[in-house]
Amino acid sequence: LANRLVSNGDYKDFIEDGGYTRPELWMSEGWALRTERHWKAPRYWRQAQFGEQQCDQQPHDQPAWAWEFTLAGRCPLEDHRPVRHLSWFEADAYARWAGARLPTEAEWEMAAQEQGLQLKQSHAELWQWTASPYRPYPGFQPAQGAVGEYNGKFMTCQFVLRGSSQLTPEGHARNTYRNFFAPSSRWMAAGLRL
């Protein structure tokens, strides 16, 4: 695995190369959602408005992606910062475009254990999408009652995220912790590592 998360600058290259207009990069369900919901960039990115400074290389009728909304409010989009607020479909399309794939949950955990602190941004930055559907670990037995019912409802149509975000409680930020969301979810602090 790469020793860093995919950056805003990396993701801009994907957009500028037509990443949101090339159906061959997308899973069919993701392409349908992208089309229906008019996705053109990560969830909270915004283009420069008329009168704001724009990138010189950007055609005048297509303002550059210049801002993102964060917990600190509207902030300039910084190329070196990790890209965030991606759906699993967007993360997967980016990986295909880059000639790579999302890591499996097991690959992510093994890399985190083996590389330790060299695996930069593994915790307290962003949850990281994996290629693994959310399933129980081998030998898992659901608890009786409401807890078992709760777990069973979520073990379908979800993908695993590993790592932790700046919003994760400290006790949850460990290599073995799993998070999960539907592949269409874009609101949470999720990015990717290839």
Annotate each PLM feature:
Residues 89, 109-110, 127, 159:
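Feature representing long, continuous alpha-helical segments
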Residues 8-9, 16-41, 122-193:
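Surface-exposed recognition segments
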Residues 1-106, 113-115, 181-193:
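Extended beta-strand/loop cores of jelly-roll/beta-sandwich
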